Structures are given as C-alpha cells and as structure tokens.
Amino acid sequence: MLNGNEWHQLHGDFLSDTQHLMGRADECLSHLELISDDKDAVECLLGTLQQIAGKSDAAHVQAIASFARQLRYLLYFAGAAGRLQPKALISLRQCLSLLSWQIELVDPLTGQLPLDDTEQQHLLEQFGCCCGIGQVESSPAVPVEWPVPITSVHSDAALGERAERSSAL
C-alpha cells in the first residue's frame, strides 16, 4: 500500500494513462459496434484492458485492476466464441462506462476507491449472460431471451435433443 505522498505523486500519471487507455477502449468498442466480429478490435480491447489492469496494479488500485481483469476474461471467451452480439456490446459499454467513472473517483490523496464491488459484479454477470457464458449462482436472475422455449421436464430424450442442438450452434 502506498502512503499519501507516494500516491499523490503517482496519481497524475495513473489518471492520465488510464484515461488515455479508456479512450482507446471506447474506440475499440465503437468499432465492434459497427463490425461485431472484428478480431482486431477485440484484440485491441483485450490489450487495453490488460494495460488498465497493469497500471492499476502499479498504482495499488486493486478494485479497478480486478474489474478490468474480470472484464477481459469474459471478453476473451465471448470474442473467441463469436458471441459479441448487440446486447452483449451494450452490456460491455456499460461495464466500460463504470470502469471509466470509477477511475475518476479514485481519491487523489489516498488512491482508494471508496465503493464496494456490487455494481461491478452485477455488470460482469450481465455481460457474461449476454455472451452466453452464464452467471454466478448466488446472483439474482438476469432475464435472457432464449431462442428455444425451455421446458421444465428433463427426460433423457429431451436432454439428448438439447445436446444435439447445442453442438449444432
């Protein structure tokens, strides 16, 4: 943990660097909104989130480092699976907006972010659900529109049929 004087010296660089990186992340996301399967835009966003996490680690702002890493993790799998549909991109934009806002809220004197991670976790779960990655069991349900009606009866034949449909997707 940095003391107040060390953090104060580091704060200007941290804020400037992360704001620049957030601008780049916004450009990458805007490109993804135009061309949702653009691998270069996904790679740019993944690299940018990794740099934000690294800068946050160096500045000892763990809440932001952790959020950037978790978002990168979900984005990596969603991009690899080709699941960055419009709803997922809207959710991703919400995550990036929160990240940007939290960077602005880091206390310039102490380097602390005086917030809990409830909203971060909610948005990460929402993004994961929009990408088809799933949600954490302890979280409240997030509405998802399924392309096929879900039945509550689980017969062996129905499970086999669902497995065949899943592998076809």
Model-derived segments and spans:
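Non-catalytic helical tethers at domain boundaries
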Residues: 1-169
